[in-house]
């Protein structure tokens, strides 16, 4: 067994012992993430341990896909894969060596920043965050890659204020359907609260609009400080989407009745679209409201794409996008969702945010309850 694992681990990879682990900063179904530093140079990195537990036939295909995609993507707003390291198989690790993906270290993730009441984004800074996020999406989509897990926790920000799309564990290449043969991608992707309605209805021939829906959820979250639709089940998530974006019908979404689950799930009837009405108490800027409204369109064919979103008046009206470095320089501690206190389900944010100045929704608490 040891020999088998040693052969599937890259034999030309360095030992991970060249790095010293400093702290765990993330954990999930994907494995664990650690902050670490290079023992000789002192360079700070993030080590993502590849989960091997259920892989009886060698290296996980999902990890191979992630590595291949990250080696392809080189952009300021996409996380940078430095190298791949390993530990050798031995009796001490049940003859299972480990693989680590080594990334440039980013000091924060967006979910961690939004969880802290002391972090206050101005409207200009929100514009810069969304501009970088959409730039990253534009780049990966131009390179025919879908992220498929857009959420605030997967948006990293460096201490210099540079945003990086991260966690490409669910990402995949996409292509336009050819010869009337639709693609058959899995629809069991994207964290539930950020999952678009087409995936919830069983669509398997999808494309970049699924990531733009997530971008819309994240953009609204910049003001609400909380995921805006927190369903407990897929059925519940569809109900929340209908309550915000209007009932899902063929009148507003042509051919939606052709989706596999359209007749099988109970869809809320008689709901009017009220994205702007529901969010205007938080989002005071009319251009911001309009862009969120265009990102959270039910029909993926009518949902705004990253190119048009970047040309939206939101980014070209006063105040213009401004650098995050100054604001972040006042926060010396890294902020990650994993390190934030656990949230109590069911509580509501009642504060309203102007974000026109450094005085968004605040309370006497140190942390926001991230429930909208």
Curated annotation (Swiss-Prot):
UniProt catalytic activity: L-seryl-[protein] + ATP = O-phospho-L-seryl-[protein] + ADP + H(+); L-threonyl-[protein] + ATP = O-phospho-L-threonyl-[protein] + ADP + H(+); [DNA-directed RNA polymerase] + ATP = phospho-[DNA-directed RNA polymerase] + ADP + H(+)
Signal peptide residue numbers: none
Chief place of localization: nucleus
InterPro entries reported in the protein's UniProt record: CDK, Kinase-like_dom_sf, Prot_kinase_dom, Protein_kinase_ATP_BS, Ser/Thr_kinase_AS
Highest taxon above the source species: Eukaryota
Extent of Polar residues compositional bias: 347-366
One term of GO molecular function: chromatin binding
Annotated region (T-loop), positions in chain: 166-191
Activation/inhibition comment: Activation by Thr-186 phosphorylation is calcium Ca(2+) signaling pathway-dependent; actively inactivated by dephosphorylation mediated by PPP1CA, PPM1A and PPM1B. Reversibly repressed by acetylation at Lys-44 and Lys-48.
Domain Protein kinase: 19-315
UniProt keyword list: Acetylation, ATP-binding, Cytoplasm, DNA damage, DNA repair, Kinase, Nucleotide-binding, Nucleus, Phosphoprotein, Serine/threonine-protein kinase, Transcription, Transcription regulation, Transferase, Ubl conjugation
Modification note: Autophosphorylation at Thr-186, Ser-347, Thr-350, Ser-353, Thr-354 and Ser-357 triggers kinase activity by promoting cyclin and substrate binding upon conformational changes. Thr-186 phosphorylation requires the calcium Ca(2+) signaling pathway, including CaMK1D and calmodulin. This inhibition is relieved by Thr-29 dephosphorylation. Phosphorylation at Ser-175 inhibits kinase activity. Can be phosphorylated on either Thr-362 or Thr-363 but not on both simultaneously. Dephosphorylation of Thr-186 by PPM1A and PPM1B blocks CDK9 activity and may lead to CDK9 proteasomal degradation. However, PPP1CA-mediated Thr-186 dephosphorylation is required to release P-TEFb from its inactive P-TEFb/7SK snRNP complex. Dephosphorylated at Ser-347 by the PNUTS-PP1 complex during RNA polymerase II transcription pause-release. Dephosphorylation of C-terminus Thr and Ser residues by protein phosphatase-1 (PP1) triggers CDK9 activity.
Ranges where the record places region Disordered: 343-372
CDD domains, alphabetized: STKc_CDK9 (cd07865)
Any one Gene Ontology cellular component term annotated for this protein: nucleus
Record's subcellular location: Nucleus; Cytoplasm; Nucleus, PML body
Sequence positions that bind ATP: 25-33, 48, 104-106, 167
Active-site residues, Swiss-Prot/TrEMBL: 149 (proton acceptor)
GO BP field: DNA repair; positive regulation of protein localization to chromatin; positive regulation of transcription by RNA polymerase II; positive regulation of transcription elongation by RNA polymerase II; transcription by RNA polymerase II
Function statement: Protein kinase involved in the regulation of transcription. Member of the cyclin-dependent kinase pair (CDK9/cyclin-T) complex, also called positive transcription elongation factor b (P-TEFb), which facilitates the transition from abortive to productive elongation by phosphorylating the CTD (C-terminal domain) of the large subunit of RNA polymerase II (RNAP II) POLR2A, SUPT5H and RDBP. This complex is inactive when in the 7SK snRNP complex form. Phosphorylates EP300, MYOD1, RPB1/POLR2A and AR and the negative elongation factors DSIF and NELFE.
Family under the similarity heading: Belongs to the protein kinase superfamily. CMGC Ser/Thr protein kinase family. CDC2/CDKX subfamily.
Full protein name: Cyclin-dependent kinase 9
Gene name, Swiss-Prot/TrEMBL: CDK9
């Amino acid at each position: 067994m040891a020999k088998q694992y040693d052969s599937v681990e890259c034999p030309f990879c360095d030992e991970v012992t060249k790095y010293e682990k400093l702290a765990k900063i993330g954990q999930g179904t994907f494995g664990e993430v650690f902050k670490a530093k290079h023992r000789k140079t002192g360079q700070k990195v993030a080590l993502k341990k590849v989960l091997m537990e259920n892989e009886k036939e060698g290296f996980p295909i999902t990890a191979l896909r992630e590595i291949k995609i990250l080696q392809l993507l080189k952009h300021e707003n996409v996380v940078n894969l430095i190298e791949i390291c390993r530990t050798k198989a031995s009796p001490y690790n049940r003859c299972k060596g480990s693989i680590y993906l080594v990334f440039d270290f980013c000091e924060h993730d967006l979910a961690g920043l939004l969880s802290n009441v002391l972090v206050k984004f101005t409207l200009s800074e929100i514009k810069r965050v969304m501009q970088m996020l959409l730039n990253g999406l534009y780049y990966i989509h131009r390179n025919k890659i879908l992220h498929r897990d857009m959420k605030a926790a997967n948006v990293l920000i460096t201490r210099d204020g540079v945003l990086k799309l991260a966690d490409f564990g669910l990402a995949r290449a996409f292509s336009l359907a050819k010869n009337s043969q639709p693609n058959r991608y899995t629809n069991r992707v994207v964290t539930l609260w950020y999952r678009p309605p087409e995936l919830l209805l069983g669509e398997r021939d999808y494309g970049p609009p699924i990531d733009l829906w997530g971008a819309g959820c994240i953009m609204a979250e910049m003001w609400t400080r909380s995921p805006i639709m927190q369903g407990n089940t897929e059925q519940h998530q569809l109900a929340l989407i209908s309550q915000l974006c209007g009932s899902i019908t063929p009148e507003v979404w042509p051919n939606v009745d052709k989706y596999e689950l359209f007749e099988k799930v109970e869809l809320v009837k008689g709901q009017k679209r009220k994205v702007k009405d529901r969010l205007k108490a938080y989002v005071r800027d009319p251009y911001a409201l309009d862009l969120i409204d265009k990102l959270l369109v039910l029909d993926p064919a009518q949902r705004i794409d990253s190119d048009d979103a970047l040309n939206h008046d939101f980014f070209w009206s006063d105040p213009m996008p401004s650098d995050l470095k100054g604001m972040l320089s006042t926060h010396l501690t890294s902020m990650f969702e994993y390190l934030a206190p656990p949230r109590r389900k069911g509580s509501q944010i009642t504060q309203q945010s102007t974000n026109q100045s450094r005085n968004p929704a605040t309370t006497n608490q140190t942390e926001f309850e991230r429930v909208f």
